[in-house]
Amino acid sequence: MTATIDDQEKNQRSNPDHEEYQYLDLIRRIINVGEVRPDRTGTGTVALFAPPSFRFSLADNTLPLLTTKRVFLRGVIAELLWFVSGCTDAKMLSSQGVGIWDGNGSKEFLEKVGLGHRREGDLGPVYGFQWRHFGAEYTDADGDYKGKGVDQLQRVIDTIKNNPTDRRIILSAWNPKDLPLMALPPCHMFCQFFVSLPPADSPGSKPKLSCLMYQRSCDLGLGVPFNIASYALLTHMIALITDTEPHEFILQMGDAHVYRDHVEPLKTQLEREPRDFPKLKWARSKEEIGDIDGFKVEDFVVEGYKPWGKIDMKMSA
């Protein structure tokens, strides 16, 4: 069973082709016809499986940062740089005023998932560890893993530069061997990059870089807006380092769900019209940044972000 947006409602939209409607229309569909399901957190969800992909243009420095509510951009950037650094310590984010991992890194939560021997904040071999040290033996968040495991992120960058038509430009956070060691298995778990080569009649133009990300568990209220912005930013970062043009970010979802206690706040969000997406500029040049590890929070300059106000939703851990 599917629910469609009627023509009358579409005609009332001032900008019916705005890419944010992909997100809003999926939320409406889930609320209307989704399957009511129990879940790990005890909150309960309304869910659909494998909805159509979202596609967001990254051309002309566009950043698909949702506008029908304010997205915590500073938190998105800090978390992304935390991933890139390979860090697995939630306290490193907390010290920057970003508490999005505090619930999963609390002593109470770690004990609940059988990891009570870890110190508070030690999340185990989560995203950043897999990106930079896949296959290395994890000890704790304070270990020195330099040169250990597979640096997938650097391999992605090297392959884009040296073999751009490769069909194996993959970044995976899903490592079955390490799942029992993680405070929370990865939700956004896998992505593939694709380089479109310059056309024959324009050999001097830059190749175009796109990213497809698969997300197994998709919290539409809180997580997905964050994840869209994060992987769009990652694509922009890699494009700068590899001298390619950011082109498109595609999100394919598995279990796409709305938590039961998010339904009413999201109905408020559905009443809002999307505004123009902002633009991303770099405060420093490619030469000044140097490599993927050279980015700083201050390098991300987002211009023209004029969202609607914040909508509070509780996180289920």
Curated annotation (Swiss-Prot):
Keywords: Methyltransferase, Nucleotide biosynthesis, Transferase. Pathway: Pyrimidine metabolism; dTTP biosynthesis. It comes from the Eukaryota. SUPFAM superfamilies: Thymidylate synthase/dCMP hydroxymethylase. GO terms for molecular function: thymidylate synthase activity. The active site is at residue 187. InterPro entries: Thymidate_synth/dCMP_Mease, Thymidate_synth/dCMP_Mease_dom, Thymidate_synth/dCMP_Mease_sf, Thymidylate_synthase, Thymidylate_synthase_AS. It catalyses: dUMP + (6R)-5,10-methylene-5,6,7,8-tetrahydrofolate = 7,8-dihydrofolate + dTMP. One of its GO terms (cellular component) is mitochondrion. Homodimer. Belongs to the thymidylate synthase family. This is Thymidylate synthase. It comes from Cryptococcus neoformans var. neoformans serotype D (strain JEC21 / ATCC MYA-565) (Filobasidiella neoformans).
